[in-house]
């Protein structure tokens, strides 16, 4: 028995010593739900942080990693401090409010500056499309279109994953699991950063939230942004630029999204009907750039 206990203690000590330290700032506009997401991480994962002490730093344990999570303020003054964390960051988490259509233009400007920063370029970024439980929340594919993420990712060689989620206090643990899977994706990419980077956007087919609208079935069968919602987005945008014109100007192809299953390379010309065939054939959405 003593020998068995000694062996277990030795294994635990070895695990602690071999954990890789990873620094991940969590950023986004104010009221996007960053703090609630950090609280969800603390409930789902072992933590070394004293929850009674208010601090921007949270230390979490996930698999063989020890994560230093920085919850940074998203107001105008707080954003001035973001660049101080870029150099030491191994990857970033960007949280946005999927239902706050009026601020999408602001999010686009911030993401453009973020990904083009030399201290960020090439590093993976996990985008948490939060508040999917809200009635007017945009789907991840529509968010990618409007923010021109494909163009940004290709230009800056930043692997990117869009994870739909609904960070709600007192929500069941199982409904928060996709954000942990998104975090695992981020760590997996960080672990392979020594390899030549390949820039991509992937959309998780998982969905979290509450209510019928956010069930896995309803999420996989929604057809994308309706004409009315697209018009509403154009009207609510700060610069009020037509969405279709913006995308065509940037050379982004518009397509009908019948579900979340599509894989294609943008460097190759797409034939008519090709997208819908691939949507039926694949299980994961991933946009790859070579």
UniProtKB/Swiss-Prot annotation:
The keyword GTP-binding applies. CDD domains: Arl2l1_Arl13_like. GO terms for biological process: non-motile cilium assembly; receptor localization to non-motile cilium. Gene3D superfamilies: P-loop containing nucleotide triphosphate hydrolases. Keywords: GTP-binding, Nucleotide-binding. The keyword GTP-binding applies. GO terms for cellular component: ciliary membrane; motile cilium; non-motile cilium. It comes from the Eukaryota. PROSITE patterns: ARF. Disulfide bonds: none annotated. Pfam families: Arf. GTP binds at residues 28-35, 71-75, 130-133. GO terms for molecular function: GTP binding; GTPase activity. Residues 204-226 are annotated as: Disordered. Belongs to the small GTPase superfamily. Arf family. This is ADP-ribosylation factor-like protein 13A. It comes from Homo sapiens. The gene is ARL13A.
């Amino acid at each position: 028995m003593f020998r068995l206990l000694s062996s277990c203690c030795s294994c635990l000590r070895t695990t602690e010593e071999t954990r890789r330290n990873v620094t991940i700032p969590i950023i986004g506009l104010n009221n996007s739900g960053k703090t609630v997401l950090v609280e969800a991480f603390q409930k789902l994962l072992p933590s070394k942080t004293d929850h009674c002490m208010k601090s921007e730093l949270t230390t979490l344990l996930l698999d063989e990693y020890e994560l230093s999570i920085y919850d940074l303020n998203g107001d105008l003054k707080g954003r001035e401090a973001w660049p101080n964390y870029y150099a030491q960051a191994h990857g970033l988490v960007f949280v946005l409010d999927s239902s706050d259509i009026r601020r999408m233009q602001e999010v686009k400007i911030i993401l453009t500056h973020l990904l083009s920063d030399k201290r960020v370029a090439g590093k993976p970024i996990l985008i948490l499309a939060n508040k999917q439980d809200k009635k007017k929340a945009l789907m991840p594919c529509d968010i990618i279109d409007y923010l021109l993420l494909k163009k940004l990712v290709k230009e800056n060689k930043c692997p990117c994953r869009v994870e739909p989620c609904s960070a709600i206090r007192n929500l069941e643990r199982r409904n928060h699991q996709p954000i942990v899977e998104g975090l695992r994706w981020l760590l997996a990419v960080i672990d392979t950063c020594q390899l030549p980077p390949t820039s991509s956007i992937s959309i998780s087919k998982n969905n979290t939230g509450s209510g019928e609208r956010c069930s896995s079935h309803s999420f996989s069968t929604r057809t994308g942004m309706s004409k009315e919602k697209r018009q509403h987005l154009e009207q609510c945008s700060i610069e009020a630029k037509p969405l279709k014109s913006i995308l065509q100007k940037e050379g982004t192809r518009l397509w009908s999204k019948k579900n979340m299953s599509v894989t294609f390379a943008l460097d190759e010309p797409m034939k008519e009907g090709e997208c819908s065939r691939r949507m039926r054939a694949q299980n994961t959405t991933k946009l790859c750039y070579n």
